[in-house]
UniProtKB/Swiss-Prot annotation:
One of its GO terms (biological process) is protein repair. Part of the MsrPQ system that repairs oxidized periplasmic proteins containing methionine sulfoxide residues (Met-O), using respiratory chain electrons. Thus protects these proteins from oxidative-stress damage caused by reactive species of oxygen and chlorine generated by the host defense mechanisms. MsrPQ is essential for the maintenance of envelope integrity under bleach stress, rescuing a wide series of structurally unrelated periplasmic proteins from methionine oxidation. Belongs to the MsrQ family. Keywords: Cell inner membrane, Cell membrane, Electron transport, Flavoprotein, FMN, Heme, Iron, Membrane, Metal-binding, Transmembrane, Transmembrane helix, Transport. The gene is msrQ. GO terms for cellular component: plasma membrane. It comes from Brucella melitensis biotype 2 (strain ATCC 23457). This is Protein-methionine-sulfoxide reductase heme-binding subunit MsrQ. It is a multi-pass membrane protein. Disulfide bonds: none annotated.
Amino acid sequence: MAAATGTRKKKTPRPGQWKLWLLYTAGFVPAVWTFYLGATGQLGADPVKTFEHLLGLWALRFLILTLLVTPMRDLTGITLLRYRRALGLLAFYYALMHFTTYMVLDQGLNLSAIITDIVRRPFITIGMISLALLVPLALTSNNWSIRKLGRRWSSLHKLVYIAIAGSAVHFLMSVKSWPAEPVIYAAIVAALLLWRLARPYLRTRKPALRPRGEAIALRK
């Protein structure tokens, strides 16, 4: 007799799925640690500002790591494409926490104070625009959106370049003087964006290195 139909196949976890969950877990460690420092009074004289700053800094760091995936593959042959989505989402989560801290803890959801602050300090507007650009990218960072949007998905996700540029400018403008830290981050972002612009020309002149682990399908 034929085997009974209608039995559902059990979904088996994709190879390396545990590495993604490990990345997410490790990615949230800085947020948990910073919250712990704030809760125990170890964030200095202005804990809210320090908490807000550190969350924003980690958002920028994860954006940089997201953009580093492609040059690393081009220059070394090491491919980390399967982790790029997770890095991008971590950047968005930290940017959202940074924004929430500003709105709730810093400004106390006082709309008039927020508007006054935006007018007085334009870098806040730049930061909010950068976050707004990340929202559609986070919402479409899934396989269903890739299938539905087709080629438009790639075009949409190019907004990340504007978002990371805005984030670097936001950081630079948020300090009264230009200490080394924001300048270094801005220089890294500028280098990554220049690499992206020059990449099509570099690829025509030099064959790309064969990525390690190329046999593993990258498209999900």
